From Swiss-Prot:
Keywords: Cytoplasm, Methyltransferase, rRNA processing, S-adenosyl-L-methionine, Transferase. It catalyses: pseudouridine(1915) in 23S rRNA + S-adenosyl-L-methionine = N(3)-methylpseudouridine(1915) in 23S rRNA + S-adenosyl-L-homocysteine + H(+). S-adenosyl-L-methionine binds at residues 72, 104, 123-128. Its main location: cytoplasm. GO terms for molecular function: rRNA (pseudouridine-N3-)-methyltransferase activity. Belongs to the RNA methyltransferase RlmH family. It comes from Maridesulfovibrio salexigens (strain ATCC 14822 / DSM 2638 / NCIMB 8403 / VKM B-1763). Its EC number is 2.1.1.177. Homodimer. It comes from the Bacteria. This is Ribosomal RNA large subunit methyltransferase H. One of its GO terms (cellular component) is cytoplasm.
Length: 156
């Protein structure tokens, strides 16, 4: 069973996001070993760009050379669920690399993180709250894993 890692900035504050993420994490866990790191939001008194830099340093401190960094960014590559499933298959084929998905806090990701990413993935051209992006990513990864296994979850 291949492993997927997640590095998130901030806890899920809304119960409906916590419930949805728990739901898809449980389902995705049937197909992959999951490792989740939740980093604290930067101190509230910092200006937004300082928060982004602070969180970026915390993210990069968690990334190992064997991690294949995939960051979510509204300017990243958009793909269909089927395309994501094909990428997921490739990303998990190399036992020496661990796909590591990163979502920043409310103000986004530091350039340092984006520049280190092998893949920049976009869920939409629209700006999404990071809690919604986390939920959507987990659902789409579950859908991608289901597609790869021929599960009826994805209706074509």
């Amino acid at each position: 069973m291949s492993k997927l890692q997640f590095v998130w900035v901030g806890k899920l504050k809304e119960p409906f996001f916590r419930d949805a993420c728990a739901h898809y994490t449980k389902k995705l866990g049937r197909f992959h070993k999951l490792d989740e790191t939740i980093l604290k939001d930067a101190p509230g008194k910092l200006p937004p760009m300082d928060k982004v830099q602070h969180e970026g340093k915390a993210i990069m401190a968690r990334i190992k050379p064997s991690d294949m960094l995939i960051c979510l960014d509204e300017k990243g590559k958009e793909m269909t669920s089927v395309e994501l499933s094909k990428h997921l298959q490739r990303w998990t084929e190399d036992p020496n690399l661990t796909p590591t998905f990163v979502i920043g806090g409310p103000f986004g990701l530091a350039d340092e993180v984006k520049n280190a990413a092998r893949v920049k993935l976009s869920l939409s051209k629209m700006t999404l709250p990071h809690e919604l992006a986390r939920t959507m990513l987990l659902e789409q990864l579950y859908r991608a894993a289901s597609i790869l296994r021929g599960s009826p979850y994805h209706h074509v």
